[in-house]
Amino acid sequence: NFIQTVGYGEDQYCQKAKDKIKAILENENVDIHFLVGGTQTNMIMISSALKDYQAVIAVDSGHINVHETGAVEFTGHKILTKPHQDGKMIPEMIDEIMREHPDEHMVQPKMVYISQTTEYGTYYTLEELKDIYECCQKNNLYLFIDGARLGSALVLKDAPTLQEMALYSDVFYIG
């Protein structure tokens, strides 16, 4: 508390943290930003990545659909949902939503949102993450991973590592 630094995110401590995260990810080219909370992160990420007519796909139990009091909808983006399977999204759900929105006069899906771990305490294995990412790539969708509970998943043997999450998603955060 006795040290003067420049504004949050621009100080030497944040730079050291960014350098450590880049080293863990084994990628010097990643963008790292510090935000104040999960809802704000979800809202900022979704609203900045999507155009006005685009939507995000989530399971019905997804945090952005149930617990964030309309934050995403406040930005003008619709959340398209499917009933979860143990709290999780599967590629078939994504494909089904894509088939349901073929018309230019409908909201256009552009992002898939998942949480690692889920609202039900389940988690995505590396293989499940790869399958979802492949489905997103096939459908030209971004994959966004809510990492508010990521620490719980990182200790599991068959869950993706941070490096693997960086490979098989377009954006994720560490809560």
Go through each PLM region and give its residues.
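Conserved PLP-enzyme active-site core in the AAT-like
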Residues: 1-175
